[in-house]
């Protein structure tokens, strides 16, 4: 991912750029604590930051330097119970030991396991503080190790609010740190800048903390130095990442290449001890399913190596090097790609079935946890050739859309490629759209949301797309460590845009092959948390700069968009050009909100009969061009129906006029013949029952 100047690189709270290797598939924190942890993460829900278009950070009413949050330093409110003090004291001792051992061994997995075993997730902010403060007084090697460990633990082991709080404590204690560490201001400034570059801290952290600290404090010096000396310079991301010599950690592609190399060397030599050493050296236990997958594919391709490779997998499981979950996932990924594999290995299905039978009989695979290899009779499978052709075309269409922003062109292209029965292809398109957007800037993320809303795909297809995205989240996390947060935001946005209903969230989880997986549960729970937040709709809409994708504007509030619609209709009705009015509707950049154009147009028709034909022409042009979909048209009419009672105060015969509008809408093809004024009918029924009473 590209890193730009600070003012250009700010991202939403749930969209974080590439780290090297993430432990996103590590075992999650106990499920019982998940709801509480996610509730605490609301302190990072999107908000507006003064003087910028930034939308993430910590809400003003949750002051992280307030004494209520300061329970470990003794300079604020502290729990009076001795139990609390004992727990915290014990945690401090063990955290110090864990950090010391980590600096000696560089064993990330050991740290993960020890923190989980230690528990007490509410104190993990102290681990962040202790890790950084101890590294500050050591060599560059330990500083780099600390920065890498924080990136690895972020979100999976240490929740974002705890990381934020840990850095808050560090900055607040900069004066004390400077007593023992002469260059504490500079070193801590680099740590803060590195955390922002690695996206484990939001850029809003700087301004937020500056407002809370005394102007003459060392903490303010740290924040200013981080901003001006490290984050405001050209190529700042690269400079910050290499400040302490960089790391020898690898990207996803590096890991895959190393896995291939170790398997090839093992096939040639048969040296299991060396293979085990190489697997341990990768230090990516959450990615061991890739070893299983690649070993199985290599065994299919090299018949003579089958026995040796299967024997390697068996022993890695017996000695506990690869756990059963990773084995199951590796086999499942092969099953998912069996159709593609069959193009190169004609009897791939038969060979894989024999591998499954052998592994199950030897006791190192639970075959019952795998999907069936036989084609699902209830779902029409796509021809491999046509599916592959569509995937390539889909990527091309999406990339072109990100450049042009032309939704109508995408609709036209998909109309050509798809038919009514192409449910699987529609899901694939949405999956690729969101996947490509997640690796780009806020503008493309916003454009992806707009396009999903505009396409009007059936909810079932969109649910399938998100299920596929969740299923592949562990792999995506290697390049995007916060894929969970990204997917949660995309899901929440789909609900706000009414592409999905709130009840569809659970269905997404149920459709995921690994139903009940920790990743799926995290995504769904986080999406629900986002949707429950105060003013969630507007926040989610504005998170990626909602509105004005063609002008790349920072976004508009719902109120501002309504005002723009009102103005463009007034100008058009008073003699404006039809083409200009259509252009203005398009440039709103919020096709999911076009029902408001329909609503206001119909209301004006009811109120000003002499201008109705001009407004009908505008609606027809917008509808025929695809600018307003039948879904948005129907929703607009329904919203007028819901407001008839208020409208009748100014226009006594509003209900009658609206009925005429509905008939005209059906005649023009805007509305389905089944459209009925449900609210009006219920009001009539209520009225008749009350009058009879």
From Swiss-Prot:
The subcellular localization recorded is: Nucleus; Cytoplasm, Cytosol
Q: Which GO terms describe its molecular function?
A: ribosome binding
**Segments passing through the bilayer:** none
What changes when the gene is disrupted?
A: Increased susceptibility to dark and starvation, and to treatment with the TOR inhibitor. Decreased translation activity associated with altered ribosome patterns, especially in the dark and starvation conditions, in which mRNAs distribution is altered and rRNA abnormally degraded. Slightly early flowering time under long-day conditions.
Q: Where is the MI domain?
A: 90-211, 254-375, 389-510, 560-681
Key words of the record: Cytoplasm, Nucleus, Repeat, Translation regulation
User: According to the UniProt record, where is the region Disordered?
Assistant: 25-60, 673-693
What's any one GO cellular component for it?
A: nucleus
User: What SUPFAM superfamilies does the database record attribute to this sequence?
Assistant: ARM repeat
Show where the record puts the motif Nuclear localization signal 2: 430-437
Q: Locate the compositionally biased regions of type Low complexity.
A: 683-693
Q: What induces it?
A: Induced by dark and starvation.
In this record, what's one Pfam family?
MA3
Give the GO terms filed under biological process for this record. negative regulation of DNA-templated transcription; regulation of translation; response to absence of light; response to carbon starvation
Give expression by tissue: Mostly expressed in reproductive tissues, such as flower buds and flowers, and, to a lower extent, in vegetative tissues, such as leaves, roots and stems.
Tagged with keyword Nucleus = yes
Q: Which family would the database say this protein is a member of? A: Belongs to the PDCD4 family.
Protein name per UniProt: MA3 DOMAIN-CONTAINING TRANSLATION REGULATORY FACTOR 2
Can you name the source organism?
Arabidopsis thaliana (Mouse-ear cress)
